[in-house]
Regions:
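Catalytic helix-loop patch of NAD(P)-dependent Rossmann-fold dehydrogenases
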Residues: 67, 74, 79-82, 102-144, ...
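NAD(P)-dependent short-chain dehydrogenase/reductase
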Residues: 135-184, 190-198
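N-terminal Rossmann NAD(P)H-binding glycine-rich loop of SDR-like oxidoreductase domains
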Residues: 1-20
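SDR active-site strand-loop-helix element
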Residues: 6, 28, 56-57, 94-99, ...
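Adenosine-cofactor binding site in Rossmann-like domains, unifying the SAM/SAH pocket
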Residues: 21-43
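Mid/C-terminal beta-alpha module of Rossmann-like enzyme folds, strongest
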Residues: 195, 202-252
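NAD(P)H-binding glycine-rich loop region in Rossmannoid oxidoreductase-like domains
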Residues: 35-77
């Protein structure tokens, strides 16, 4: 099973390339495929003759998209449509990675794959558009929603992962202020990658249906609790100030509660991903 990972320099992309069989995996970074050049997408993928294409790329500068969504639309929607069409032509499975931000956060309980999305930011609207395009244009597909993703090296667009930034600021003695009114399920990208490594062959063989899949570590916490736990586990002493989302003055709205329930994974008999604290501890030890 030949797998092409688009966005192989990103948090999840790097982990996918790490866990998938090297002889059967091709990772594409921006120098290999610029997603703003939609005309290059189909021929690039066709030349690689994939059985599966995983789109782990995203334009995820959430606040910047409120001012100008051009890049977000191009990468999160237009390029997704081009990849989905290419996969349809190749008879390949298309796996597209999306986000918990497609929900408005008002449910007050974990969202399942059956819950209706209601994105409130420009970024989130482009991500939902990508989901809909992937599902409508690629007959064989899986849209995988993740939440609070982190990995070693982090997101280049955000200056590293949340954990990397928190630990660096604490060690430098800089003040830490973290929101305490956004509840999510922080998720180590490696755990998502290992789950997908098991799921891809089942999807490819038709043993798992096309559709939506939530893939996150279990449990829930605020970003404030997550930061304090990271410092505790890393043995770094620092004061963390709890602030509200409103106090931070972010331009884009964020869901107050965006915990995802991995209902469809459970229905397939897939093991639950470990609790977020256990994943964080393993991440810090890796």
């Amino acid at each position: 099973m030949r797998v092409v990972v688009v966005g192989a320099a990103g948090q999840l992309g790097r982990e996918l390339v790490r866990v998938l069989p090297p002889a059967e995996t091709v990772g594409l970074v921006r120098d290999d495929l610029d997603l703003h050049d939609t005309g290059a997408i189909a021929p690039t993928l066709a030349a690689l003759a994939p059985d599966v294409v995983v789109n782990a790329s995203a334009e995820n500068r959430v606040d910047a998209a409120e001012d100008d969504a051009t890049d977000a639309v191009a990468v999160n929607a237009v390029a997704v449509a081009a990849m989905a069409r290419a996969c349809r032509g190749l008879g390949a499975l298309f796996v597209h990675v999306s986000t918990d931000y497609v929900f408005d956060g008002r449910a007050g309980r974990p969202y399942t794959e059956d819950d209706a999305p209601n994105p409130e930011s420009a970024y989130a609207r482009t991500k939902l558009a990508g989901e809909l395009l992937a599902r409508s244009l690629a007959p064989r597909h899986a849209v995988v929603r993740v939440a609070g993703l982190y990995a070693h090296g982090g997101s280049r667009g955000k200056g590293g992962s949340f954990i990397d930034r928190i630990l660096a600021q604490a060690r430098e003695g800089r003040p830490l202020r973290v929101v305490n009114d956004q509840i999510t399920a922080p998720t180590w990208a490696r755990d998502v990658a290992e789950t997908l490594a098991r799921l891809l062959p089942r999807l490819r063989a038709g043993q798992a249906p096309s559709g939506l899949y939530h893939v996150t570590n279990s449990g829930a916490c605020s970003w404030y609790e997550f930061a304090r736990t990271a410092l505790e586990l890393a043995g770094v002493r620092a004061e963390v100030g709890a602030v509200s989302t409103g106090e931070l003055g972010a331009r884009a709205p964020r869901p107050a509660y965006s915990v995802l329930a991995n209902a469809r994974l459970a229905a397939l008999g897939e093991p639950a991903l470990r609790p977020w604290r256990a994943a964080l501890e393993a991440y810090l030890a890796a």
